[in-house]
C-alpha cells in the first residue's frame, strides 16, 4: 500500500496524494467493506474473503481450497465472469475494486507441536482463513480469523495453538516460527490468493 501511494504521488507530480495507514489503525481488516461503503475510509488494501461474513460467495473471489493455479484463477476472474459477479455485489454498496496482487500457494500452517495425523488436529485452536476454515472445523479444529499483526501475540498467549497466514517469505516477518516451529507444505486451502484495492 505504501509503495502504491508513493507511486501515485510521483506519477501525479504531487497533485494526488494517498495517506496510507497501518493495518487495523482505522478499522479492522474485516470491517473495510462497510467502512468504505459508508465513507469512513476512502479505500483499503483488502481481500474479498474478509467480507464473506456479509456475502459468503465473496470467499470464492480470494481463493478456493484445492483450487486452480493462479493463471487459471485469474482467467476465471477476469475473463470468465468472476469479477463481474463481485462487481455487481460491490455496486450495491457504492464500492469498486481492482485486483491488485496475487501470490502462489501457502503452507498448511505453523504448529507448536509436530503433526503426524489428522487426529492430532481435533480440539486444536487455529487461526484459519476463508473456506479452508470450514474444512478445518469439520475435522474438529476450533478456527478463528485474526489479522496478521494479531497472530503472534495470540500464539504467545496460547489463544491459538497454530496458524496459517501466507507464504513463508511473508510469514517470517511476523515471527511465527519462533513459537510454532513446525511448518507443513503444501497449503491445500490456498493454491493462489488474490487481494484487491477496494474503493
List the predicted regions and their residue ranges.
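N-terminal secretory/targeting leader peptides
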Residues: 1-73, 83-199
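Short beta-strand-centered segments that line the small-molecule binding cleft or hinge
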Residues: 76
Amino acid at each position: 500500500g505504501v509503495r502504491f501511494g508513493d507511486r501515485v504521488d510521483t506519477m501525479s507530480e504531487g497533485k494526488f496524494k494517498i495517506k496510507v495507514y497501518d493495518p487495523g489503525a482505522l478499522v479492522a481488516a474485516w470491517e473495510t467493506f462497510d467502512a468504505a461503503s459508508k465513507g469512513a475510509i476512502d479505500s483499503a488494501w483488502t481481500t474479498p474473503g474478509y467480507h464473506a461474513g456479509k456475502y459468503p460467495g465473496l470467499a470464492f473471489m480470494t481463493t478456493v481450497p484445492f483450487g486452480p493455479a493462479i493463471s487459471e484463477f485469474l482467467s476465471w476472474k477476469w475473463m470468465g465472469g468472476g469479477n463481474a459477479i463481485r462487481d455487481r455485489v460491490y455496486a450495491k454498496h457504492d464500492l469498486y475494486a481492482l485486483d491488485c496482487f496475487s501470490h502462489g500457494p501457502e503452507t498448511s500452517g505453523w504448529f507448536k507441536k509436530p503433526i503426524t495425523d489428522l487426529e492430532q488436529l481435533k480440539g486444536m485452536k487455529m487461526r484459519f482463513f476463508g473456506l479452508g476454515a470450514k474444512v478445518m472445523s469439520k475435522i474438529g479444529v476450533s478456527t478463528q480469523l485474526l489479522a496478521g499483526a494479531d497472530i503472534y501475540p495470540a500464539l504467545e498467549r496460547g489463544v491459538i495453538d497454530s496458524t496459517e497466514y501466507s507464504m513463508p517469505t511473508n510469514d517470517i516477518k511476523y515471527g511465527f516460527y519462533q513459537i510454532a516451529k513446525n511448518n507443513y507444505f503444501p497449503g491445500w486451502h490456498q493454491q493462489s490468493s488474490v487481494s484487491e484495492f477496494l474503493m
